[in-house]
From Swiss-Prot:
Name of the molecule in the record: Aspartate--tRNA(Asp/Asn) ligase
Site (Important for tRNA non-discrimination) location in chain: 38
Keywords from the named record: Aminoacyl-tRNA synthetase, ATP-binding, Cytoplasm, Ligase, Nucleotide-binding, Protein biosynthesis
Gene that this polypeptide is encoded by: aspS
Protein family (similarity comment): Belongs to the class-II aminoacyl-tRNA synthetase family. Type 1 subfamily.
Enzyme Commission numbers on file: 6.1.1.23
Amino acid sequence: MGEQLGGLKRTHMCGELGVKDVGKSVVVMGWVNSRRDHGGLVFIDLRDRTGIVQIVFSEQVSKEVFEKVQSVRSEYVLAVEGEVVKRLPENVNPKIPTGEIEIYAKNLKILSKSETPPFPIEDRSNVSEAVRLKYRYLDLRRPSMQRNLITRFKLTQAVREFLNDNGFIEIETPMLIKSTPEGARDYLVPSRIYPGKFYALPQSPQIFKQLLMIAGFDRYYQIARCLRDEDLRADRQPEFTQIDIEMSFVEVEDVLDINERMIKHVFKKVLDVDLDIPFRRLTYQEAMERFGTDKPDLRFGMELKDLSDILRESEFNVFKNALKNGGSIRGINVKGAASMTRKQLDELVEFAKNFGAKGLLWMQVLEGEVKSPATKFLTEGELNKILERLEAEVGDLLLIVADKDEVVFDTLGHLRVEMAKRFNLIDESKYEFVWVVDFPLLEYDEEEKRYVAKHHPFTSPKDEDIDLLEKEPLKVRAKAYDIVLNGTEIGGGSIRIHDTELQKRMFKVLGFSEEEAWKKFGFLMEAFKYGAPPHGGIAYGLDRLAMIMTGSDTIRDVIAFPKTQNAVCLMSDAPSEVSEKQLKELHIKIDL
């Protein structure tokens, strides 16, 4: 059985001790990281969240304590009292901050014993993610995981600090809300008091933050828990955290400005990185045409170039058909990649097919010739113009796709990133932010045969496009903006509709009858009747931002207790079956 503290009080954290503490009597507490027995001396590295300190147990100092330490093993929890001593020069360990000192133990309490853990508690530990998630409390003892969660804490702390100083009020919104099935599936919570009725867990605080603006709070924020029952793609979680922000009496530039200043503050505070503001701005159209994506990674070039005008008269069927069907021909230049083998080029063609491309045309620019399956279909003039447009030099590889615009963009956008990774063109030390603005307000859903909101139904159209809402809905641009960091969207928002009539028109274009719109969003529509200010905001994916700031490979590494990709908690075994009694109370019958 473990000993009690018995009045012993910790004086220092393990990683905080240094030469300044030599001669002091200290009490440290933590876990045994490692143990080494050298006959008359036992060395223990004691670990807490601040780091490691070496403790020396010597027969000369205390025979009783020396005998007691013989039973101690890895991950035992100890309280140690002793004197801080400067190490001899030959024993200094430069790898750890406490490497110049050690503690000579005078008193030892074994607070808790440990079985041998299923994997070593160290960053080098080569263990499967499934085992790490099953024993998450052990995984979280590893220094890298503790650093990640402490960085995440510092991130939320810096966000709060900035927003508090800029007149924002933190307000919590409800977790049990009305289900409004638009977007992802809701998680439903049955009501025991009202049999047959259900609450939903919030996918975001969207409607409530708008109501807070109507209530006159002017500037709101919340570190909000959000839940979506969606089919999990790579690196999505059923529950996640948003930095949620809303402001009254603002236009797009006001929102972008305060967010740039917040991000600058956060990066300086957490990572000591100085960011230049304002960030770059790209319209949605420009981002698609230059980078093939609305989430462009600007740490490298390799921009898409439109070749359609050069090849308009081409006799090559692939080009002819693409242009005839309203598509385009575009290409990228991968500098210095002409040395790729035929096998590697064939793999690239297969890679391109994953994104709907029927094929991929490659050109190797060599000394005195251009090697490509397409050269025989091109005139010399066409070939020279392609080389000129793509700024080709000897040693370059040109990749060209001809298809519908969306296929061309998607394929070349992914190829651009793939080639940058293969040829190490990405400077991992850079943070490249960009605002993508002027998104289309609507998209057409072929399955449902109706228009759907690209962001959500409360996004305001640009003033100059309002008249197109019923006539040419797909031409309407939104007062919407996404913030992208190194090719990852970390946040997005919009100016909202604050006018009842415009909101009704929007619902109509989306195919909601007035009755249906009222049934889903009646309480918001009712609130609009009583004077709504112009308002807008943004929400950041906190997990994704923390992942980038810690250099982690997955958001699971910045969440204390994440679910797997199949939405399962391997540690607690959630979701699980519940008792018949619980189901009966809720008037629920399981029909599998």
